């Protein structure tokens, strides 16, 4: 029994456990489904069999029920997420129960039960709900009077409603919850889905004003829905006077603020009390409730009043508020009438200004009303403007005005308090400047070729622009030719002209043929800007060549036969393609006296020309060659054509005959009827022979005696007539047919006893016509004289003859060079400031080399030699060209310079030589060529008044015109300004100082100080402003001319003068980059509209010519990658004498061009500095970055000026140098005052270094040694150094600096050094010393800045730049503020060797000045200049890169770019 009991108990436990687990499973499987009332919801379950039953509670749902839809769908296994362990798929079913239009009654448990199998079931709990929503509420804005009751409500739809509803419904005020609101709120349930939520106040007061919001929250506290209702509690208004001010003798301005009590103000009432009276009275004006300010009037002047204000709304009147102070009216009304004037204008704007109001009226004027009207009989208002009063009284600019139009302006002052304005000012007239004109109308371009003179011209005509936009003063004509030649494609021009109004046409002569010309014409108004261009074009037809070179020929013996060998020149086809060449031989009849021009000579056949009875000289075509088969050497008289290939000859002749279509192939001679012998008269039968017998002798190599014999024989031959019937038809060779058209070109055997000449005919095809050009006659030649045999290679006599001749020539050359060498070493090395000297070597070189320059045939030369031609030098060859000429103490330069022409056959100086004009020349040998001189307007009919020592000089490709002039003298300043005015000059380049070498070089032709004015004749000059840079001064001069006639407009102009400061007479700048930058600055502001550039120095030839030449050569180098220095200077000297006056200046051209060719433009502007330097430092995939390449060029560039270090290298001074590699140059070393009884006491290892302004601003020194500390302090005292920079560490060792000061004071010879105090700063230590020269009892205060942050490793630079920047700022500012006036007082900096660290500091000081004053830097040029002044400066790429990095940081730190934009 016990066992049975235990088993029954165990079974019962298992059953109970199963039931419990099943209950848990059932409970866990119930799914909750929220169903929105009014929407549909679907319940899904899966089963293995199709038969399932759906129940709601215990009620089975019928499939036919209208509110339910039941469907079953088969689906694959695992779709419900269960695992399928069988190997093959089996089918399950998805059962869906859809509840339609859910309502509250649909709430309950739904069960899906399978009717077969294990009766699995799935239970769903459906809970209907409605989302909360406010259906209705109190109006959005509700008003209640104070102490009235009010109820706010919200009708809310929501389901289910339960115990949490009260907690989830809240009223908020102004967005916040308040506990008192729960006290006044209530909830009333209307039905299962609607409730009313109310907020009720029995009495409302001002504090109940606000916005209330009924809100439904969820259980987490998030807002579900809400509705805002604003409650306004109305009360009487409250008004307070904020501001009161008397604005007139009987007016007071009031301004107030108001609380309207949530009800619009209807009226304001003002009560007032006059001081001294007991009661307040109402003001006559009732003020509308919309006002917050008002002007009260009808007060007594200069009387004090007390004011009150009351506001009224629908609730009632508020309490009166009184302004605390009494208001006293003015004794007069404040009236200000501005005095207006125009202060500036442009083409579309006019700026006006007026005087500021007096101080006592400023408070009553807040703005101005301005009116601009277009002038006329009835002024037309263009614009009205409001301009606020400002403390700076800034002017006002009207824009968008018409150009060159008169306007009238009026201004009146207005008060913002009274809303009234004072009287208008008087009308002021202003005129806008001229604008940009539209294009000229009716532009006509005609290309014309004159067949007689063969001249080409282009006629251009135009009319005024349709809309000039001002007064047109001139027209700019731009003519550019595009050659049609396929061989020579060099562009013609551009040629630029300026034609003054009222002329509307111009003529370009001597233009090139075979060119398509494009012309642009633009009008220039007084605004100096080009107008819209009108463009046209025309085609100049082809023409024959301009020149046919000399044809050389000689007689040769070919196979025992006499023939003529011609050397044909290659002729340019620029003017048109040459299709054929024809060679004519002329057999000269010795009775002829002269030949007609080749084009007039009758042409016969070979047979006719060689007839024995021909009595006049005739020509025949000996050879005809097309351009296709052109060859430079031709044999005549060999009875052969130029080629033995018949196909070539046929093709050649076909080309030439086609070229000659429409033109007779031969010019046939007239038929000559010869009378019987004896009756032939000279006048009918003879042509005169050549008139110049010398040419005949020379051409035939005959003596006078031989010539007489030859003429006698030829006359005998002519008298022997071989045919009685027709002597003309007799021929030398009777076997040749008398005439055959196929033999019109026949190179027959020549008559050895006849004189021959010839000429070359060039044929150019122009559409339907053939154009011919003819060479001059060849030199006369007689084959009968000894001919030059065509030598065989085995002819030893020939080679022996050549060897003897060559040896003689070589011996002569050796002798000449020996003579040159002797005279070269005897010549004085120190030339007198570059003046030209003519030595024996000069004479010999001129005799040897002549002046071989094909482009300068007008040079005055000796003999028949042509000028020297150096030829163009490619950019890459500039360095070698400079070095080759630099050898042997600049012998190459000297030889080339001495070949420059000083005189020209086509240049005269008659006007300069006139007695009346001699006093106008500063130097008697510097004259102005008559052909290119600047002519002034004649005064009172005196012709000599048109003279000034100045010439027009054309720049590269005629793109720029200069006027090169001598510096004005006191007696010529008026003429100088007349020239500036008449030539419309706007840019002056001055290259001299007023005094040099204690001699006057130029008179001062501008006023003394800025804002001063000075009269020069009719010209009034005002010194407007001045800007100084390191190399030059830029001055702005405003110039006007006295009116010639009453009513004439006064013409005002602005002239800019660029005064270069550091170029001495006869000399050349030591560093080329300064003058190159100067030229670039001038070019950046130059335009054709600004007229020619006036350049002058003292004489107007040396420095002036060098600058003009350099400007042209730089342009040529940039465009062509090569330069022709010699030819350029020759061309310039042809326009003004002696341009580039000294050898040093000529050498400088090479140096400057080498600099430009090597480095280009290295200037970096501040606005692009960061990106430009980043681009330089950006490394390509392979190779080095641009900055590294630039630095390597910098290291490779040798200093062209030899600099000795002899003093520092003396054995006695070696112990004073830390390194024998770093020695100061003699030329700029610091020289100490010698000490008595002590030798070599003047030396210290220190160098003067030029600063930004090219003065010796700095001293760079090595760290003093123990034995040179006294010398160091002597240098400080003698140079009056007040600022000392130390960039080294104190200590012992080769790279350390000894402590060269004591804690108190120490004396070195006569120098006493007293230490005062020190101050530690973040990047440096500052120390003060007193240095006393005991000899002269002079004490100097010296401030030392010791930099603390430099890396101790040699060659390293600081990682960050801030420390150096701070040092530069502090030290350089101290130097500027404390340097001793009247002496150099240079800033002295020292490091170990006086190289790397010191050079970085000095470079940064220079670059900072450059950046601040010019808004750009040239680190490359600054580095090159520094390196030329002391060995070892900026000697590594790391240092060079640091400068670039540091200057960017300096600009960013000091916001220099931003200040530039401002």
Swiss-Prot record:
Catalytic activity: O-phospho-L-tyrosyl-[protein] + H2O = L-tyrosyl-[protein] + phosphate
Catalytic residues, chain numbering: 1097, 1391
Protein's UniProt name: Tyrosine-protein phosphatase 69D
Sequence ranges on the Extracellular membrane side: 29-805
Alphabetic keyword roster: Cell adhesion, Disulfide bond, Glycoprotein, Hydrolase, Immunoglobulin domain, Membrane, Protein phosphatase, Receptor, Repeat, Signal, Transmembrane, Transmembrane helix
Domain Ig-like C2-type intervals: 29-125, 131-230
Cell compartment(s), UniProt: Membrane
EC numbers for this chain: 3.1.3.48
Keyword Glycoprotein listed: yes
């Amino acid at each position: 029994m016990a066992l049975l009991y235990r088993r029954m108990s165990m079974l019962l436990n298992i059953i109970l456990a199963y039931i419990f687990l099943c209950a848990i499973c059932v409970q866990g499987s119930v799914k909750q489904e929220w169903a929105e009332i009014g929407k549909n919801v679907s319940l899904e379950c899966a089963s293995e069999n199709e038969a399932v039953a759906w129940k709601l509670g215990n009620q089975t749902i019928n499939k036919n029920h209208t509110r339910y839809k039941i469907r079953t769908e088969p689906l694959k296994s695992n779709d419900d997420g269960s695992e399928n362990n069988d190997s093959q798929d089996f089918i399950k079913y998805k059962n869906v129960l859809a509840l339609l239009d859910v309502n509250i009654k649909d709430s309950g448990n739904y069960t899906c039960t399978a009717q077969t199998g294990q009766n699995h079931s799935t239970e769903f709990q459906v809970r209907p709900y409605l989302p909360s929503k406010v259906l209705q509420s109190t109006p959005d804005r509700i008003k209640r009077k104070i102490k009235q009751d009010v109820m706010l409500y919200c009708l809310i739809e929501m389901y289910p409603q339960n115990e949490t509803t009260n907690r989830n419904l809240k009223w908020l005020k102004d967005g916040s919850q308040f506990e008192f609101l729960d006290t006044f709120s209530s909830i009333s349930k209307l039905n299962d889905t609607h409730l009313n939520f109310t907020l009720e106040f029995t009495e409302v007061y001002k504090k109940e004003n606000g916005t209330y919001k009924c809100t439904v929250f969820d259980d987490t506290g998030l807002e579900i829905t809400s509705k805002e209702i604003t409650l306004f509690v109305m009360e009487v208004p409250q008004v307070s006077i904020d501001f009161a001010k008397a604005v007139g003798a009987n007016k007071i301005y009031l301004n107030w603020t108001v609380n309207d009590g949530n009800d619009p103000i209807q009226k304001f009432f003002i009560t007032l009390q006059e001081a001294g009276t007991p009661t307040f009275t109402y003001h006559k004006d009732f003020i509308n409730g919309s006002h917050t300010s008002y002007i009260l009037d009808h007060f007594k002047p200069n009387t004090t009043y007390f004011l009150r204000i009351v506001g009224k709304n629908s609730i009632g009147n508020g309490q009166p508020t009184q302004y605390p102070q009494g208001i006293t009216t003015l004794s007069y009304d404040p009236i200000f009438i501005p005095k207006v004037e125009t202060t500036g204008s442009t083409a579309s704007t006019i700026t006006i200004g007026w005087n500021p109001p007096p101080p006592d009226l400023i408070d009553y004027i807040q703005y101005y009303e301005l009116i601009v009207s277009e002038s006329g009989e009835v002024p037309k208002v263009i614009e009205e403007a409001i301009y606020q009063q400002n403390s700076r009284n800034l002017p006002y600019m009207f824009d968008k005005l018409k150009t060159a139009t008169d306007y009238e302006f009026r201004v009146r002052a207005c008060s913002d308090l009274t809303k009234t304005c004072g009287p208008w000012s008087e009308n002021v007239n202003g005129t806008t400047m001229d604008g940009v004109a539209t294009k000229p109308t009716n532009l006509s371009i005609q290309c014309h070729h004159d067949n007689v003179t063969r001249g080409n011209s282009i006629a251009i005509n135009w009319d005024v622009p349709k809309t000039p936009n001002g007064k047109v003063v001139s027209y700019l004509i731009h003519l550019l030719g595009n050659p049609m030649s396929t061989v020579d494609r060099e562009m013609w021009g551009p040629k630029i002209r300026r034609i003054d109004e009222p002329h509307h046409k111009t003529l370009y002569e001597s233009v090139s043929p075979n060119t398509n010309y494009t012309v642009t014409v633009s009008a220039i108004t007084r605004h100096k800007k080009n107008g819209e261009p009108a463009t046209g074009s025309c085609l100049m037809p082809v023409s024959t060549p301009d020149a046919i070179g000399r044809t050389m020929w000689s007689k040769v013996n070919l196979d025992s036969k006499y023939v003529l060998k011609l050397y044909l020149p290659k002729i340019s086809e620029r003017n048109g393609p040459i299709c054929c060449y024809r060679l004519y031989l002329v057999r000269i009849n010795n009775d002829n006296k002269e030949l007609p021009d080749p084009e007039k000579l009758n042409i016969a056949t070979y047979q006719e020309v060689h007839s024995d009875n021909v009595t006049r000289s005739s020509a025949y075509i000996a050879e005809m060659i097309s351009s296709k088969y052109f060859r430079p050497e031709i044999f005549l008289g060999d009875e052969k054509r130029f080629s033995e290939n018949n196909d070539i000859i046929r093709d050649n002749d076909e080309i030439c005959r086609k070229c000659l279509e429409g033109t007779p192939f031969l010019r046939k001679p007239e038929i000559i009827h010869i009378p019987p012998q004896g009756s032939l008269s000279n006048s009918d039968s003879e042509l005169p022979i050549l008139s110049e017998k010398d040419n005949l002798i020379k051409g035939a190599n005959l003596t006078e005696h031989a010539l007489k014999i030859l003429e006698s024989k030829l006359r005998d031959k002519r008298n022997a007539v071989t045919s009685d019937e027709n002597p003309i038809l007799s021929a030398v060779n009777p076997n040749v047919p008398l005439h055959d058209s196929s033999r019109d070109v026949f190179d027959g055997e020549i008559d050895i006893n006849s004189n021959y000449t010839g000429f070359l005919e060039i044929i150019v095809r122009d559409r339907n016509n053939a154009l011919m050009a003819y060479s001059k006659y060849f030199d006369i030649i007689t084959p009968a004289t000894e001919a030059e045999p065509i030598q065989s290679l085995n002819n030893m006599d020939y080679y022996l003859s050549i060897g003897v001749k060559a040896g003689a020539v070589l011996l002569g050359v050796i002798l000449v060079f020996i003579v040159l060498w002797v005279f070269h070493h005897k010549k004085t090395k120190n030339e007198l400031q570059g003046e030209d000297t003519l030595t024996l070597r000069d004479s010999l070189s001129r005799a040897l080399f002549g002046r071989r320059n094909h482009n300068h045939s007008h040079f005055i030369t000796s003999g028949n030699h042509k000028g020297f031609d150096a030829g163009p030098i490619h950019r890459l060859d500039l360095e070698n060209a400079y070095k080759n000429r630099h050898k042997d103490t600049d012998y190459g330069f000297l030889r080339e310079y001495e070949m420059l022409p000083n005189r020209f056959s086509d240049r005269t100086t008659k006007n300069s030589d006139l007695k009346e004009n001699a006093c106008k020349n500063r130097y008697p040998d510097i004259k102005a060529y008559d052909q290119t001189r600047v002519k002034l307007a004649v005064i009172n009919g005196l012709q000599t008044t048109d003279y000034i020592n100045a010439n027009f000089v054309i720049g590269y490709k005629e793109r720029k015109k200069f006027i090169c002039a001598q510096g004005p003298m006191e007696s010529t300043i008026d003429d100088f300004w007349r020239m500036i005015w008449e030539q419309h000059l706007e840019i002056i380049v001055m290259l001299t100082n007023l005094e040099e070498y204690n001699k006057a070089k130029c008179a001062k032709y501008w006023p003394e100080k800025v804002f001063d004015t000075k009269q020069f004749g009719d010209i009034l000059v005002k010194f407007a402003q001045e800007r100084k840079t390191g190399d030059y001064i830029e001055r702005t001069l405003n110039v006007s001319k006295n009116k010639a006639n009453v009513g004439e407009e006064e013409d005002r102009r602005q002239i800019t003068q660029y005064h270069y400061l550091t170029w001495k007479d006869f000399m050349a700048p030591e560093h080329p980059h300064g003058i190159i930058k100067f030229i670039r600055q001038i070019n950046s502001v130059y335009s054709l509209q600004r007229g020619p550039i006036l350049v002058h120095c003292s004489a107007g030839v040396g420095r002036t010519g060098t600058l003009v030449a350099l400007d042209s050569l730089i342009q040529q180098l940039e465009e062509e990658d090569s330069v022709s220095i010699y030819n350029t200077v020759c061309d310039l000297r042809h326009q003004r004498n002696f341009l580039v006056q000294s050898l040093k200046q000529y050498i400088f051209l090479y140096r400057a061009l080498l600099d430009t060719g090597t480095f280009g433009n290295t200037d970096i502007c501040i606005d692009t500095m960061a990106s430009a330097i980043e681009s330089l430092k950006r490394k390509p995939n392979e190779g080095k970055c641009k900055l590294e390449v630039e630095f390597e060029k910098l290291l490779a560039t040798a200093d062209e000026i030899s600099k000795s270090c002899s003093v520092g290298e003396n054995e006695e001074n070696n112990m004073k140098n830390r390194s024998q590699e770093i020695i100061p140059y003699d030329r700029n070393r610091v020289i100490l005052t010698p000490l008595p009884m002590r030798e070599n006491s003047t030396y210290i290892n220190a160098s003067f270094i030029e600063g930004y302004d090219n003065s010796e601003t700095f001293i760079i020194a090595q760290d003093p040694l123990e034995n040179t500390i006294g010398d160091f302090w002597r240098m400080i005292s003698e140079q009056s150094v007040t600022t000392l920079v130390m960039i080294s560490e104190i200590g012992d060792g080769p790279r350390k600096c000894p402590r060269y000061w004591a804690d108190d004071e120490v004396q070195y010879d006569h120098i006493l050094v007293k230490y005062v105090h020190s101050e530690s700063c973040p990047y440096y230590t500052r120390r003060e010393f007193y240095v006393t020269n005991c000899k002269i009892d002079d004490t100097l205060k010296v401030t030392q800045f010791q930099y603390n942050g430099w890396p101790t490793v040699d060659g390293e630079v600081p990682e960050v730049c801030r420390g150096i920047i701070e040092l530069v700022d502090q030290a350089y500012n101290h130097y500027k503020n404390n340097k001793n006036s009247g002496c150099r007082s240079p800033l002295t900096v020292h490091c170990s060797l006086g190289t790397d660290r010191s050079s970085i500091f000095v470079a940064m000081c220079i670059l900072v000045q450059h950046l601040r004053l010019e808004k750009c830097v040239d680190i490359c040029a600054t580095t090159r200049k520094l390196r030329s002044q002391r060995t070892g400066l900026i000697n590594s790429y790391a240092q060079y890169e640091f400068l670039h990095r540091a200057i960017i940081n300096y600009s960013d730190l000091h916001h220099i770019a931003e200040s530039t934009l401002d």
